[in-house]
Amino acid sequence: MQIHNRKQTGFTIVELLIVIVIIGILAAITIVAYNGIQNRASDTAVQSDLRQFASKVAEFHAINGRYPTGPNSTAAVEGIPKFRLAQGSYSTNMHNFYYCVGIVGGIEKFAIGAVSLSGKKFAYYSDNGLQIYTGVWAASAQNCPGLLPTVDPYTYGYGHNATTGWNSWTQ
């Protein structure tokens, strides 16, 4: 009778645990990188919307010699009945995408402000272009004095209401 001693091959529990830990670390790194990419994509989409809307406002100004007035409500901004926003890129737990117009130092100016899904705030100014907005983001029309320090009166419009959602002109 012959007895064969065969050594069993396979992975030990320690080796399997090491592999599982390494996979977990790689997954965590991937998730963090993916979130960063998503945030940058949202920021870029919001900035693009601000530039495009500012272009529409400038076009209105070139034709009419003044900036369009805001409706002071959820209605569309004068002369811009529809404007499709990249809605998935915006924070929706607050009023968002503000257009403000008023007189500053005797000169008519406008500002557009928005908060990205990443939480970054951006503003486009008629005299300074696109910038990161560092002011406080408030509720309702209180954003306009921060975006555009005007003397009353000013008019405004906004695209998203925290309670009722996106206004029809933004779709």
Can you name each region flagged by the protein language model?
Residues 34, 39-90:
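Conserved hydrophobic/amphipathic alpha-helical signal-anchor segments
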Residues 108-171:
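Short, surface-exposed interaction loops/tails
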Residues 27, 33-36, 41, 110-116:
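Short, solvent-exposed linear motifs at loop/edge-of-secondary-structure regions
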Residues 14-33:
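Alpha-helical hydrophobic helix detector
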Residues 58-62, 96-102, 111-113, 119-125:
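Mobile, glycine-rich extracellular loop/lid and propeptide segments
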